Amino acid sequence: MDEDLVLALQLQEEWNLQVSEREPAQEPLSLVDASWELVDPTPDLQGLFVLFNDRFFWGQLEAVEVKWSVRMTLCAGICSYEGRGGMCSIRLSEPLLKLRPRKDLVETLLHEMIHAYLFVTNNDKDREGHGPEFCKHMHRINRLTGANITVYHTFHDEVDEYRRHWWRCNGPCQNSKPYYGYVKRATNRAPSAHDYWWAEHQKTCGGTYIKIKEPENYSKKGKGKTKLRKQPVSEAENKDKPNRGEKQLLIPFTGKGYVLGETSNFSSGKCITSHAINESQEPLSQDHSANALRPHSKTEVKFEQNGPSKKTSVASPVLSTSHQNVLSNYFSKVSVASSKAFRSVSGSPVKSLTVGDSTTKSVSAGSQRRVTSSRTSLRNSLKAMESTYVTVPQDAGGPEGKLPSKRPRIEDKTFFDLFFIKKEQAQSGGGDVTSSSHPPAAAQSPSGASGQSRVVHCPVCQDEVSETQINEHLDWCLERDSTQVKS
């Protein structure tokens, strides 16, 4: 039994020694351990940020953005603040950190995360950026992780590697320390007045900076890019523009415009207007009474070509010279202020008796008969057109002749004339309209009214009428004209 006990104790001691040797190996590795260079040489930036935020900053940096910067070459990282709302972004220099070991990436990221934490928690009391608050968190994280976070970086060689554009001053400052007149930059931006030290340099030195170094084939690459970019733009701009030597052909206006609804097949055709919608119906005469058209009346537009005639939709016609003559005779547009066409009689405008203007009319009985006959012929033609529009839908047999029965337009004067004529017939009971309640002008003598001896001339029949009876007399004259049209 003693031998067995001794053997058991020996085995227990050996086991304890093995366990004691394994315990240090089970401790977590440091964030900057050298073994990470082989295990994870290029870590995920966003993954590291989420891990460090949970372990060292209590999840306070969830609203902070972290990303790589491909143009930043002067510093390893930067933290940009955006107001007091807790929004900020961390940018790390990809050109500098991709040449450095993983340890530098971790330390730079933790450095910028401390700046973001101080800003988010409104504890940014460090006016210089790396004050006591920053150093407190920096030492805390260094003790927990074994890292060596500092307030500066030592990537000077990498920074100089990207400064490939050099300038040197040709003035006295080229012999003074510490720069000896050199200006080295990563971008092709020559020293100018935009630099904060430019004014002082002009006072003390006054020299000119001359470029002495740039990357290989930099000028050739720049010229090639500019040529490739400018050629398509210049071609696109000058594509639709004529050359300066060429003259633009100016085509004068021929006087013929475009008809609404016209297609390319009708471009060579000749446009004519016709009042007949049915082809078998005879056209109206071409005298003044037939050509008197209202602007709102609808006529059919035909296009004559070498082949068979084609019809288009109904459109408003363009009044010809004969139409305009009839309208000008019936609807006089001469102003009453014209001394040639009118004269003042007892304060009322009366048409002048002089002959010479085509729009003035004589007050003689013969001229009145001519005016009355022209009005009668005009109204007869309008009445014939109205009957034509009413009877066409019944006679039209083809699909082109079928027109839907529509209510007459309110603007049509013919419709109003026929409406008032029918209304007067219904009121008079079929009797003669001339036997209306309006007496003739002779019966309404101005002598009947005492104290009112002022007499004016009627603008329609040129009779002398009392000023108090002129409105009733005008109504009677208009009714007489409508009666003549009816007869």
UniProtKB/Swiss-Prot annotation:
Q: Where is this cross-link: Glycyl lysine isopeptide (Lys-Gly) (interchain with G-Cter in SUMO2)?
A: K302, K340, K422, K423, K486
Which parts of this chain are annotated as the region Disordered?
219-248, 280-317, 347-379, 427-455
Composition bias type Basic and acidic residues, residue spans: 236-247
GO BP term, pick one: response to UV
An example molecular function term from Gene Ontology annotations? single-stranded DNA binding
Per UniProt, the short sequence motif SHP-box occupies residue numbers: 253-261
Annotated Zn(2+) 1 binding sites: H111, H115, H130
**Hey, which family's this protein in?**
Belongs to the Spartan family.
Q: What is this protein called?
A: DNA-dependent metalloprotease SPRTN
